[in-house]
Each structure stands twice: as structure tokens, then as C-alpha cells.
Amino acid sequence: MSLTRLHIETFRNISLAQLDPGDGLNLIYGQNGSGKTSILEAIYFLGMGRSFRSHLSQRVIQHNDDKLTLFANLSVCEQESKIGLRRFRNGETEVKINGDNIKRLSTLAETLPIQVITPESFSLLFEGPKSRRQFIDWGAFHSDKSFHLAWANVRRILKQRNQLLKNQVSYSQIQYWDKELVRYSEQVTEIRKQYVDSLNEQLKGIIGEFLPLVEVKVSFTRGWDSKTDFGQLLETQYLRDVAAGNTGSGPHKADLRLRVGVLPVQDALSRGQLKLLVCALRIAQGKLLKQQTDKNSIYLVDDLPSELDAQHRKLLLQQLMDTGAQVFVTAIEPAAIVDSLATPPSKMFHVEQGCVTVIDKPTRE
């Protein structure tokens, strides 16, 4: 899977740009503020319907326009697909895949699986469980078609249950919702657990490449004690949940725990090692996606030279190339990337003040 053409219009500081990326590694370079990260952001927006830099999507639309337009040709198993997205300042979104109107943004994510490695993505290990649940759920969504609806049902029921808790209704009025919550929670949890088990198998060898002297143990916690019946737990904790006004246990509290020995990785590893661990997690996800669905992810790697030293930069780039995936990497100076590659990039693009120029014959400096 790879993007063969990308059209960007009125997105951030890019008024109009068209790129024909290569199948392998695409290097995008330019000074800070030139617009190189905006290209990665546009690809992400096309696959997810939102930005990885801001939760306010309207901010990515140029101030003198009322909409942005993104379009791409996508090659999948030698077949061409077309994806188009238009986002208006009022929040409305139009999405088309091969000319058909698409109602659900999840269809975009299914069509264009994207992995992101940016300075912000290293917060996966430092922030709360939410970001790690999202990491698990990316894989669960792609590995099992029933996950998306089951998780949507969990969130819908939790919203209803929490409102009833705030209204301090009797447990008999909540009992029906608890039965439904248990049903879908068990489905979500089983899919998540199976996914993490499969991810662990992929992860072992990759962590060995990045952190050869470190043994990292990865475990999944479901959001309640696995030895406890979830339905009974909801009833037992009812008064506590009423006092809190929300549901204290469930799949919305799940987490991915990573340890070295008995210590959390945050306490056992240096910041540089933690960055390598996040890279290993992202690569493992991409390899598992390929194994389970025969689809490659598209990797977006922002500002790589500032995050890793030359040795580990070379290792990461080699690991990315070994996945067979299409990769987009940004840097201020092209030499920082070119000198870390065994072969030249598939394509190079220079960005200056929102204008993109293709460099036809990338060479080492």
C-alpha cells in the first residue's frame, strides 16, 4: 500500500501542492516553519479526519479560506483507489472514496492505516492510560472488524449509565444497562487481549534490535480484576459510582503496562531508551498489521534527527525500510537522513514557505 499522488489545498501554510511520492522512503526537508510537517499532517488528516497536532481541526484551514481540500491516489495490491476529503470551517466534512460518499470517518482509517512517530508520540509512555488504550485500539480496530461497533456500544452505554449515576437513580434502573455493558465489555476486552498477545510476539525481536541488553515485559490490564465477575463488580461498586458520578471500572480503564523487571519502563530506562521503545512499538504494530491483513501501514516520521543520535537514527530507518512500508520523513538538513540510509531515498522534496519542490535525483552530500 502506498500513496502515488497527494494533492493539498489551503492546508496550514500550503496554499496548493501536489506530490507524487515514491513507494519507499520519502524525505521532506526544509527550515522550521516551512511547511514540511504540514505535509505529514495532511496525510494523517486524510487517513483519520483530524490533525495529530491540534484537536481543533478548523485551525488547519488557511485563515482566508472557508475549507481545505485533500486528495490522494492510493495503490493497494496493484489496484488504484482515490480518496478525497473536504473540511469546512463550520466543522462539516465531505469524504469520498472512489467517488462514493462516505459517512463514517472510520472507513478512512480502515482504508489508509497510518503510524506516526513525532516528538509528541513519545508521550505514549509518559501520559495516562488513555494514549495507551488508543494505541491498543488502533490495532484492535484493524485486526477485528467487530471491534469498532463493540467499542462504540461500550462508550454509548457508559454515557447513559454515568448520566443515571449522576441522577442517583436506584440500581434496578441501571441493571439493564449493566447487562449490556458486561456483554460488550467482554467482547472488547477479548479482542484487545488477543491483539496485545499477538503484538508481544512481534515486539520481542524488534526490542532486541533497539535495546539488546534490556528485557521489556508487556502486559494488558482490562480495567478491572480479571478474577472478578464484571457484572457483580458493577453492582458491588454501585454506591461508590453514584458518589463519583461515573463508572469506576471497565474497559474504559484498560491499560498497557511495560516493565523492566519489577519497575515501570519510565523508571528503569533513560529518556533515549524510552524513545527507542516507542519506535519499536510502532514498528511492531505495522508488522503485525501486515501479517494479519496483508496491508502495510504508511509511516509518518517528523523531525527524526532531533530525536535520535546518528546510530539509532540509522537503526530506525533500516527497521522502517525492512517493513516494506511507505515512509515519509522530515528533517531540516537532508544529509542527516541520506547519510543514515544504505540506499538513497525513493523521492526527496524541498519545502520553503509552503511551496514544495521535488528533487529528481537524490544523492549523498
Swiss-Prot record:
Q: Which residues bind ATP?
A: 30-37
InterPro entries given in the database record: DNA-binding_RecF, DNA-binding_RecF_CS, P-loop_NTPase, RecF/RecN/SMC_N, RecF_2
What's an example of a GO molecular-function annotation for this chain?
single-stranded DNA binding
Annotated localization: Cytoplasm
One GO biological-process annotation of the entry reads: DNA synthesis involved in DNA repair
Which is a Gene Ontology cellular component entry for this protein? cytoplasm
Keyword field contains Transmembrane? no
Query: Its function?
Result: The RecF protein is involved in DNA metabolism; it is required for DNA replication and normal SOS inducibility. RecF binds preferentially to single-stranded, linear DNA. It also seems to bind ATP.
Name of the protein in question: DNA replication and repair protein RecF
**Whose protein is this, by species?**
Shewanella halifaxensis (strain HAW-EB4)
Q: What is the lineage of its organism?
A: Bacteria, Pseudomonadati, Pseudomonadota, Gammaproteobacteria, Alteromonadales
Tell me what gene encodes this.
recF
